[in-house]
A protein has these predicted regions:
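Enzymes that bind and transform nitrogen-containing heteroaromatic metabolites
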Residues: 1-184
């Protein structure tokens, strides 16, 4: 069975807004590139999809080597966007307007590599339903003080207990925390 993995950068105070956080350095970028090697499908919400593309498609042709690799991989991967309003999508993307929990549970059963969840908007819903198997939080050494957070107040119905799998401290001071859902 495929695993569903959530991986995201966030500040010490839990801010996940891309505009509030610095870009990863080469070592952190390499970590995300390696993580993406075991993935063949990415799931986004509409807003994150519209932030990521066409940015990464363009970046794949203009950036340094690490960003080029990441952009090319991201653009080439199959993607699903969960949206009721998006009319069209590009870059190997299909739009799904049904329940994300049901769709991702179906996709987990299909043959293939892991599924990467690239949005926090669905995190409470997916986490509570037990869809997400692993969490990779890369903590940036800063307090953002504002912006969207990993989980907004009131969106998680009950606590989510996780089990630590691994940690990594990058030279930049960024810290990767790898968790899996705790077995009941």
């Amino acid at each position: 069975m495929r695993k569903v993995i959530l991986a995201i950068n966030m500040s010490i105070d839990g801010c996940v807004g891309h505009m509030s956080l610095p870009a990863p350095d080469e070592e952190v970028g390499g970590y995300f590139n390696n993580l993406m090697r075991d993935v063949d499908l990415i799931a986004y919400g509409r807003k994150m999809y519209e932030i990521m593309f066409p940015y990464w498609a363009d970046e794949a042709n203009l950036a340094d080597e690490l960003d080029t690799q990441f952009g090319q991989r991201l653009t080439a991967l199959d993607k699903v966007v969960f949206s009721r309003t998006l009319a069209s999508a590009e870059y190997n993307t299909r739009i799904v307007s049904t329940d994300p929990v049901e769709e991702l549970l179906k996709l987990k059963q299909a043959a293939g590599k892991n599924i990467y969840v690239g949005t926090v908007s669905m995190l409470p819903q997916l986490a509570q339903a037990g869809v997400i198997d692993e969490y990779h939080f890369v903590v940036v050494p800063m307090i953002a003080g504002q912006g969207p957070h990993l989980v907004e107040d009131g969106t998680l119905a009950e606590k989510l207990n996780l089990e630590l799998v691994a940690t990594k401290i990058f030279k930049s001071g960024w810290i990767m925390l790898h968790y899996k859902k705790r077995a009941e």
